[in-house]
Amino acid sequence: MSKASDMVRTEVTRPSPYNSGLTITEVMQRYAPARIAKLGSNENPLGPSPTLATMLQAGAEMFRLYPDPAGRELRQAIAAKYGFGEDQIILGNGSEDLLSVISRAVLRPGDSVVTLYPSFPLHEDYATLMGASVKRVTVNDDLTINADALIDAVRERPRMLLFSNPMNPVGSWLSAGDLSKVLDAVSDETLIVVDEAYAEYAEGDDYASSLPDLCERDQPWIVLRTFSKAFGLAGLRIGFGIVGDPELRALLDRVRTPFNANGMAQAAALAALADEEHLAKVVALAKAERTQVESLLRNMGFDVAPSRGNFLFFNCRQNASAFAEGLLREGVIVKPWKQEGFDSYVRVSIGSPAENDHFMAALSQLL
């Protein structure tokens, strides 16, 4: 009998399986803690807008019918909110779905992709699946983004520049000035893809979304956003891309799976988008708690990366998986990082005040 690995392309065997971490159920079954703080996936502790409750009560019809495959109403709302044309908006089953769509549409065997490192693993995995090589630009020793190295890398004319800003898992970010310098160095042959999954948590500081700068440029570009984080819809899987060239958006639509944004997700995203008051509350809480948790970690002697996300990345000074195992026994789920060179680092999500207190108490027990 043929081996399963003989039936698939060689590229399929190269990425490691995605590590989503343990679920609450798995932690309860394995460790039986008195309570659990789930701080490993950067979820929103306040949840979605309260207006979704009314929508859910009327949801039976949405379950029965196919959704609008084009997501017209949601795309119109997104376009209006961000100041773009409806023909520039593409929907995805989470923004990582769009990472797959873009990679399948654009990348060819032998192409190169420049990305930041450490990275959201799927930034590399989808490129690898398409037979492209990945050029990593590692952060500085202080865990800030090395803009000069990024500029040098894009001058080699890669097929794609793909990075998150703020950066996942580190939390660091490009200032408007550094972002502009990087984009100046990119040729017209390179597709710029900026993953702004955490942009809502960063706005108002010295962070700048790439959108205003990209709008002034003729280069091909896509900015990805998600409803999973600040909007609190991680379980429904809904994200979107803003594409500079409507023709490119139309071509990506040919690669996208039909009905990739389900009806409930589209309706929930519309409600979440309209509730600006709830979004402001979510962001304010995350920023306040992030400042407090960062201060406490530093006071304990940990090196903590600067962050504009709803998470912190810190050096636990030991094997991160063993460290995270100790926290699991106390009922706290964090994300031990496993990429080479960063396996002593942990990413902890900013939760509710009670969850953050639970994390700090558990951490104190380990020290």
Curated annotation (Swiss-Prot):
InterPro entries in the record = Aminotrans_II_pyridoxalP_BS, Aminotransferase_I/II_large, HisP_aminotrans, HistidinolP_aminotransfase, PyrdxlP-dep_Trfase, PyrdxlP-dep_Trfase_major, PyrdxlP-dep_Trfase_small
Q: Which cofactor does it need?
A: pyridoxal 5'-phosphate
Q: What domain of life is recorded for the organism?
A: Bacteria
Which Pfam families is this protein grouped with?
Aminotran_1_2
Q: Where in this protein does the record say N6-(pyridoxal phosphate)lysine is found?
A: K229
> What pathway, per the record?
Amino-acid biosynthesis; L-histidine biosynthesis; L-histidine from 5-phospho-alpha-D-ribose 1-diphosphate: step 7/9
Q: Which GO terms describe its biological process?
A: L-histidine biosynthetic process
Answer whether the UniProt record assigns the keyword Transferase to this protein: yes
* Catalysed reactions listed for this entry: L-histidinol phosphate + 2-oxoglutarate = 3-(imidazol-4-yl)-2-oxopropyl phosphate + L-glutamate
Give its E.C. classification number: 2.6.1.9
**GO MF term set:** histidinol-phosphate transaminase activity; pyridoxal phosphate binding
Q: Which UniProt keywords apply?
A: Amino-acid biosynthesis, Aminotransferase, Histidine biosynthesis, Pyridoxal phosphate, Transferase
Which pairs of positions does the record mark as disulfide bonds? Answer: none
Indicate the family of this protein: Belongs to the class-II pyridoxal-phosphate-dependent aminotransferase family. Histidinol-phosphate aminotransferase subfamily.
Record note on quaternary structure: Homodimer.
- What name does the UniProt record give this protein? Histidinol-phosphate aminotransferase 1
Q: Which organism is it from?
A: Mesorhizobium japonicum (strain LMG 29417 / CECT 9101 / MAFF 303099) (Mesorhizobium loti (strain MAFF 303099))
What taxonomic lineage is listed for the species of origin? Bacteria, Pseudomonadati, Pseudomonadota, Alphaproteobacteria, Hyphomicrobiales
GN (gene name) = hisC1
